[in-house]
């Protein structure tokens, strides 16, 4: 997954600019982001403050780590079942 060049704090700041009355197109042009990216950020971070955004990011990272651990454990389980299933 491509890493964002904006931190959560920067994204929330950009969203707040638009909420303060600056046109969406102007905010996007000023920061060099597409309107699609802006609205994706608004759907994800709209209404969050910086600490909530950090918590969301931490939870997403933990979720991804746990999914990788589960996949590894499932592969190990399949390998062990195959090994034990063979007759000696």
Curated annotation (Swiss-Prot):
Keyword Hydrolase belongs to the record: no
SS bonds (residue pairs): none
Superkingdom: Bacteria
UniProt keyword list: Transposable element
SUPFAM superfamilies cross-referenced by the UniProt entry: Homeodomain-like
The keyword Methyltransferase appears for this protein: no
One GO biological process term: DNA transposition
Molecular functions (GO terms): DNA binding; transposase activity
InterPro entries for this protein: Homeodomain-like_sf, Transposase_8, Transposase_8_domain
Assigned protein family: Belongs to the transposase 8 family.
Record-given protein name: Insertion element ISR1 uncharacterized 10 kDa protein A3
């Amino acid at each position: 997954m491509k890493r964002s060049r904006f931190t959560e704090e920067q994204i929330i700041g950009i969203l707040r600019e638009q909420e303060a009355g600056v046109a969406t197109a102007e905010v996007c042009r000023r920061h060099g982001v597409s309107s699609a990216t802006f609205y994706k950020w608004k759907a994800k971070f709209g209404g969050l403050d910086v600490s909530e955004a950090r918590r969301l990011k931490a939870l997403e990272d933990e979720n991804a780590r746990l999914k990788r651990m589960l996949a590894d454990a499932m592969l190990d389980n399949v390998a062990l079942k195959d090994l034990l299933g063979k007759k000696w």
